[in-house]
A protein has these predicted regions:
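Switch II of P-loop NTPase G domains
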Residues: 169-176
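ATP-dependent carboxylate-amine ligase
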Residues: 1-56, 68, 72, 88-93, ...
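Walker A (P-loop) phosphate-binding motif
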Residues: 9-14, 98-146, 245
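Conserved motor-coupling elements within RecA-like helicase/translocase cores
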Residues: 154-157
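Acidic, Mg2+-coordinating active-site environments of NTP-dependent enzymes
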Residues: 47-51, 58, 64-74, 78-97, ...
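Short beta-strand "acidic-cap" motif of Rossmann-like dinucleotide-binding folds
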Residues: 35-40, 139-141, 162, 234
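Residues in the short beta-alpha loop(s) of Rossmann-like NAD(P)-binding domains
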Residues: 40-42, 144, 219-220
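Switch II (G3) loop of P-loop NTPases
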Residues: 159-168
């Protein structure tokens, strides 16, 4: 896997920029100071938002859309026969998958990676809001918009970068997590792991071993199995949690606890 250097300004073209995931990446790359262009098969709210932000986004795929790009990033849905991908290969412009560009972004900050079968977006959103309220000015790429901020992608001046770690394609192993958070571990996306749950658990072990700080949900058996293998801080409602939630009260749009 090629991880490009994004410390200097680049001209980056995104194929499939209208999807939520690639749109978030485009947003962050633009805020980092790179010249970002893109294309998608049709107009949509993400395309419109990127245009409003100042990016040139084409509708339809054509070799001419590459312009003077020196780096091309493509979504998982884009085939090698795509005319823009073929043109980039002919011009020897590096073509990266989403799983290549995310580690390059995370390398520019201290990374907090939220991994797990479920709950990544919710946990990442709560963490982002907590850090914003604490004036830590975090950057983040989250799988959904944070309502209070109006975006799921922010590049700010603080030292921390929050990102969801996807185990479905092993991307979480290359994000350079300084702090690793695991919400739960269940047998999912096993096609990536030869249909072997043990291989999935081994990947999670590799993920947390590389981090300086590990945080696990004490309520999940899979996360606790991981915590026994690689100890860390635990949280949840379970009595054995290091940080335990008690006196839980649920409101219409909120949950409070001690």
């Amino acid at each position: 896997m090629m991880i490009p250097d994004l410390s200097e300004a680049r001209r980056i073209h995104l194929v499939g920029a209208g999807g939520a995931g690639m749109g978030a990446i485009a947003d962050v790359l633009h805020r980092m100071g790179h010249t970002v262009t893109g294309s998608d098969l049709k107009d949509g709210p993400v395309v419109e938002r990127l245009r409003v932000a100042g990016m040139e986004i084409h509708v339809g795929h054509d070799a001419a859309n590459l312009g003077s790009a020196d780096l091309v990033a493509i979504s998982t849905a884009i085939p090698e026969r795509n005319p823009e991908v073929r043109a980039a290969n002919e011009r020897q412009i590096p073509v990266l998958r989403r799983s290549d560009i995310l580690p390059a972004i995370s390398a520019e900050r201290r990374s907090i990676v939220v991994a797990g079968t479920h709950g990544k977006t919710t946990t990442s959103s709560m963490l982002a809001m907590a850090m914003v309220e604490a004036d830590l000015d975090p950057s983040f790429i989250i799988g959904g918009d944070v309502n209070e901020i109006g975006s799921g992608a922010v590049w700010a001046d603080g030292e921390w970068f929050i990102i969801e770690g996807d185990e479905s394609d092993r991307t979480f192993l290359s994000l350079g997590a300084e702090i690793a958070i695991v919400t739960n571990v269940e047998p999912d996306h096993l096609e990536t792991y030869d249909n072997d749950p043990e291989q999935l658990m081994e990947a999670f072990v590799e993920f947390v071993e590389a981090a300086t700080t590990r945080i696990y949900c004490a309520d999940d058996p899979g996360a606790m199995q991981l915590a026994r293998a690689v100890p860390g801080i635990t949280y949840g409602t379970a009595e054995h949690a290091d940080y335990r939630m008690v006196d839980i009260e649920t409101g219409r749009a909120s949950v409070t606890f001690t």
